[in-house]
Structures are given as structure tokens and as C-alpha cells.
Amino acid sequence: MQRLFAGKLRFAFRHFPLTEVHPWAEPAAEAAEYAATQGLFWEMHDSLYANQDELGLPLILALGRALGVSDLGLRDALAQRTFASKINDDFIGGVRSGVNGTPSFFINGEKHQGSFAYEELAAAIDARLHAGAAP
């Protein structure tokens, strides 16, 4: 999408950990935020997502190590819940915006109710652009 709508699209990621479904979702989000301090947010996010069914502290730390994330720093950030308030703020903001699951997409502040298929999202963004509203 970002390539298709280069210069016309702003992408904002928000955490929405569903802890009742994934007990390690919140620590995983915190780990991704710590990795972001080292420029490795998306790499950590993708590794955590790919391994979401096996997550636990040992695996989160191992994934971080594999990416070159500081092991001691990550342990500290998780133990002290350094990024917990940011994750909570993202979650509360999502609830207030009508998010009740993931993934959720908003186009120009309006929740996309259709399919998440590439073609449908692209068509919805394109329709907004042609209506004069920047997504």
C-alpha cells in the first residue's frame, strides 16, 4: 500500500494486545517497543508474530538475541514494564475508536468495515483520495 500510494498515505501502527486470547501479547508488544529503541521494531514484531503460538519469556529473549537486540536491556524493559503505559495507551485509544479485534484499519479516521484483502483496501483508499480526503 505504501508503495502504491507513495506520498499520499500515512501508516500508523497501534498495539492492541488481546491478552485473554494471547497471554504473551502484552509482553510481546513491550519487547517490540524495546527493539524499536534499537531500530528493530518491525523485525521484532515480525519474529514475534511468526512465533505467537509458542511465545514465552525464553523465546521472546531468544528472538531478540537473534536480531541483535540487547539481551540485558530487553530483560530489564520487560521486568520493569518500561513500555507498558504506551501499550495501554494504544489499547485504550483503540477501544475508544471502536477497535474490538485485530487487524483493524482506519482510512482518514473512519474504521474500514470491508475485507482486508489488498485489492479492497486499495480501492477504499483510492475512493477516499478521489473524494478529496487524504487517507
Task: Please give the residue ranges for each predicted region.
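Structural alpha/beta surface segment adjacent to cysteine/selenocysteine redox centers
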Residues: M1-R65, D126, A131-P135
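C-terminal cap of thioredoxin/glutaredoxin-like
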Residues: M1-Q2, P58-P135
